């Protein structure tokens, strides 16, 4: 193939340098430059569409007018360093605590002077650096996450400073001694407390609540601030949904390793200044919002979560005084006489049942509303139509919250109303309402016989088909199994998760509901049981069925022999290994079955030791003890401790374990005391003293 002719040597270099010099001289040429419009006109043709630059010019003008500060960017080396540091901290692969401390100190030293570019500074120092910039940071896509994390980390510091004030001068002196003058120069003596820093953030954001309430990123930060000021848990199940958008940045993938995140699971003590600031903040957030605007905000995808937090704080933290206050957010959203007159307010509440966003607000109201309001709400709006609401995909979640609050009589009445809808719910795999009914029936001691009959008629009388329908397990051929091993595993469907949870709830309920699942397990062949055990979702129901209790002893006696010859395969599977561990507790009162299963593990020792999962099962079954000290393993298998020789020494927390000589002395003393009981009290005490001294005399004689 012919090649392109190219010049080589000094002539080519000379021509390239000349061309480069000419290119550099172009911008300084006095010749008038052709504008973009002229260029477009010159190139215009029949099929030419001119480029509209008006939008670009407007964006540039808006960008020039925007006063959002630019804090700079990290260079490539700094980005690579902090990215690797973040990965190292997430993996937490340090040899010891000193190694981790030295690594963190080196990261702090590298981050000095770059606090507004990254968020890896000590909490209060970083708080000081961010002060004055929070209004812009909370509206930034990534900086808003930094602010939320900073506030969550600083919340426990407020409580700790209230409990025990710290001597900041002494603290700074210790820092200088540990890290030198360079380590203590960034911590001034007049460093503000965490409470003052939070109050400074609120004062900095004041006057801007109106548009921050519905701002896509700042609204998340407002929710965090509200919960911190109220002292509410920041990691609870009820507040986790409204804190932040977890799907946006995949926040759940980061595993929390700090102890400060573990201290915010429950309610915290907050200073009085926080209560006053919280009332003022809620008042400013809702200032100028009438009932019409609040009802529109209830279905707003960004503003509704903030409204949920405000209502939960008003109804849960501020007492009953807010219910009587006509200016409160709750009373402006739902007036006092709304539920009685059945006017526009009732229509508004009915519309929330079927709205994806408004139903979440209704769940919050049902969860935190006072008992008087809830009874009226249930009587006038929900009770007569709870069956149709349970059938709806969105309204069913509100029904679940309602079922968690009703009394035993109302629960039984609700069950009778929902029973006609059971076949439809089973057919469409909407099992969360049924699971909630079973859970609440266990707590309220309600009758579930009618529910069991409805479920049996919906799933059929065939036990194996019923088990497969509930757990979502299908029989696979060998070719299909080989194909599944090659293909990547897909995520578990919600229908299978709900089915597994329903089976677990049925097993926890005594009577007919548990018998339905147990009989289904007994009718299933061994291949199906192994398939269920190796399924990460369905195996949970199998583990629940294996939990020992007095009511399922007969079931376990019939069911456990089905695992003979399967222990090795179960131990080498990621889900089946959990079932193998559950078999240890399941055979606590069936020692002959436990010995048979343990012998299977011992026969397959090489395969188990070559696998990480197999080694875990080997350790949990104490197989080393089984091979070397069979008697001690038998005591452990029966649930007995070696130190528990007699009832008098059963309490191991009373003192250290007694030696054989001490135990012999105790038995000798007890025997002597029984022999001296027919005599008088004085003789009994004298005989006891002689008995206690007898073993020591015998020891000296030896």
From Swiss-Prot:
Give the Basic and acidic residues compositional bias ranges: 12-22, 52-61, 673-685
**Spans annotated as Disordered:** 1-68, 162-189, 639-702
Q: Which Pfam families match?
A: PUF_NOP9
Localization in the cell: Nucleus, Nucleolus
Question: Which residue stretches does the UniProt record annotate as biased composition, category Polar residues?
Answer: 643-652
Q: Where are the Pumilio repeats?
A: 288-325, 344-379, 380-416, 520-561, 562-599
- Mitochondrion: present as a keyword of the record? no
Q: Drop me one GO molecular function for this one.
A: RNA binding
What InterPro entries does the database record attribute to this sequence? ARM-like (IPR011989), ARM-type_fold (IPR016024), NOP9 (IPR040000), Pumilio_RNA-bd_rpt (IPR001313)
Which biological process terms from the Gene Ontology are attached to this UniProt entry?
A: endonucleolytic cleavage in 5'-ETS of tricistronic rRNA transcript (SSU-rRNA, 5.8S rRNA, LSU-rRNA); endonucleolytic cleavage in ITS1 to separate SSU-rRNA from 5.8S rRNA and LSU-rRNA from tricistronic rRNA transcript (SSU-rRNA, 5.8S rRNA, LSU-rRNA); endonucleolytic cleavage to generate mature 5'-end of SSU-rRNA from (SSU-rRNA, 5.8S rRNA, LSU-rRNA); ribosomal small subunit export from nucleus
* Feature: compositional bias, Basic residues: 1-11
Q: Name one GO cellular component term.
A: 90S preribosome
Q: Which UniProt keywords apply?
A: Nucleus, Repeat, Ribosome biogenesis, rRNA processing
Into which family does the record put it? Belongs to the NOP9 family.
Q: Which PANTHER family did the record assign?
A: NUCLEOLAR PROTEIN 9 (PTHR13102:SF0)
Q: What does this protein do?
A: RNA-binding nucleolar protein required for pre-rRNA processing. Involved in production of 18S rRNA and assembly of small ribosomal subunit.
Q: What is this protein called?
A: Nucleolar protein 9
Biological source species: Arthroderma gypseum (strain ATCC MYA-4604 / CBS 118893) (Microsporum gypseum)
Q: What is the organism lineage in this UniProt record?
A: Eukaryota, Fungi, Dikarya, Ascomycota, Pezizomycotina
């Amino acid at each position: 193939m012919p090649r392109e002719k190219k010049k080589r040597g000094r002539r080519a270099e000379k021509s390239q340098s000349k061309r480069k010099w000419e290119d550099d001289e172009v911008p300084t040429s006095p010749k008038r430059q052709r504008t973009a419009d002229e260029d477009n006109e010159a190139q215009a043709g029949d099929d030419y569409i001119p480029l509209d630059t008006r939008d670009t010019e407007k964006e540039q003008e808006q960008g020039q007018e925007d006063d959002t500060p630019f804090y700079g960017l990290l260079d490539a080396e700094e980005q690579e360093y902090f990215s690797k540091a973040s990965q190292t901290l997430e993996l937490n692969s340090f040899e010891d605590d000193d190694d981790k401390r030295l690594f963190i100190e080196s990261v702090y030293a590298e981050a000095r002077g770059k606090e507004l570019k990254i968020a890896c500074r000590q909490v209060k120092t970083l708080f000081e650096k961010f002060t004055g910039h929070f209004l812009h940071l909370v509206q930034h896509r990534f900086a808003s996450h930094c602010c939320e994390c900073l506030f969550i980390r600083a919340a426990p510091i407020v409580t700790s400073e209230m409990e025990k004030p710290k001597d900041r001068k002494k603290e700074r002196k210790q820092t200088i001694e540990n890290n030198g003058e360079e380590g203590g120069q960034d911590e001034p003596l007049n460093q503000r407390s965490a409470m003052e820093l939070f109050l400074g953030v609120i004062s900095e954001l004041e006057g801007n609540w109106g548009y921050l309430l519905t701002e896509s990123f700042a609204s998340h930060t407002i929710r965090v601030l509200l919960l911190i000021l109220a002292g509410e848990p920041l990691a609870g199940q009820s507040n986790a949904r409204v804190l932040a958008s977890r799907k946006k940045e995949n926040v759940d993938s980061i595993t929390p390793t700090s102890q400060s995140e573990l201290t915010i699971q429950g309610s915290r003590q907050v200073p009085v200044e926080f209560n006053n600031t919280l009332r003022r903040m809620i008042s400013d957030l809702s200032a100028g919002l009438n009932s019409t605007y609040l009802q529109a905000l209830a279905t707003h995808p960004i503003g509704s979560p903030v409204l949920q937090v405000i209502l939960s704080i008003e109804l849960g933290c501020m007492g009953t005084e807010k219910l009587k206050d006509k200016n409160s957010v709750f009373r402006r959203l739902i007036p006092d006489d709304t539920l009685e007159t059945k006017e526009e307010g009732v229509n508004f509440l009915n519309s929330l049942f079927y709205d994806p966003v408004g139903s979440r607000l209704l769940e919050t109201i049902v969860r935190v509303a006072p008992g008087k309001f809830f009874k009226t709400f249930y009587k006038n709006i929900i009770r007569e139509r709870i069956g149709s609401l349970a059938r709806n995909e969105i309204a069913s979640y509100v029904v679940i919250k309602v079922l968690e609050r009703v009394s035993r009589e109302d629960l039984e009445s609700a069950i009778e109303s929902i029973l006609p809808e059971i076949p439809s719910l089973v057919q469409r795999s909407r099992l969360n309402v049924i699971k909630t009914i079973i859970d609440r029936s266990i707590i309220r001691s309600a009758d579930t016989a009618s529910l069991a009959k409805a479920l049996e008629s919906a799933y059929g009388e065939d036990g194996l088909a019923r088990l497969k329908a509930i757990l979502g397990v299908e029989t696979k051929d060998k070719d299909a199994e080989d194909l599944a091993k090659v293909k990547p595993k897909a995520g578990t469907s919600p229908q299978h998760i709900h089915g597994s949870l329903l089976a677990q709830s049925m097993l926890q309920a005594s009577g007919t509901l548990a018998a339905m699942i147990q009989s289904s397990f007994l009718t299933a062949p061994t291949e199906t049981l192994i398939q269920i055990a190796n399924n990460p979702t369905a195996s949970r129901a199998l583990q629940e069925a294996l939990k020992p209790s007095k009511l399922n002893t007969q079931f376990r006696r019939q069911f456990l022999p089905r695992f003979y010859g399967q222990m090795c395969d179960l131990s080498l599977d990621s889900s089946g290994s959990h079932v193998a561990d559950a078999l240890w507790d399941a055979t606590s009162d069936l020692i002959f079955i436990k010995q048979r299963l343990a012998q299977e593990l011992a026969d397959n020792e090489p395969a188990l030791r070559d696998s990480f999962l197999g080694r875990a099962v080997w350790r949990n079954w104490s197989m080393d003890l089984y091979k070397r000290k069979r008697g001690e393993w038998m005591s452990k298998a029966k649930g007995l401790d070696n130190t528990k020789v007699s009832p008098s020494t059963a309490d191991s927390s009373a003192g250290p374990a007694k030696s054989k000589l001490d135990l012999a002395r105790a038995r000798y003393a007890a025997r002597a005391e029984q022999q001296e009981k027919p005599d008088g009290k004085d003789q009994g005490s004298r005989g006891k003293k002689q008995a206690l001294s007898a073993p020591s005399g015998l020891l000296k004689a030896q």
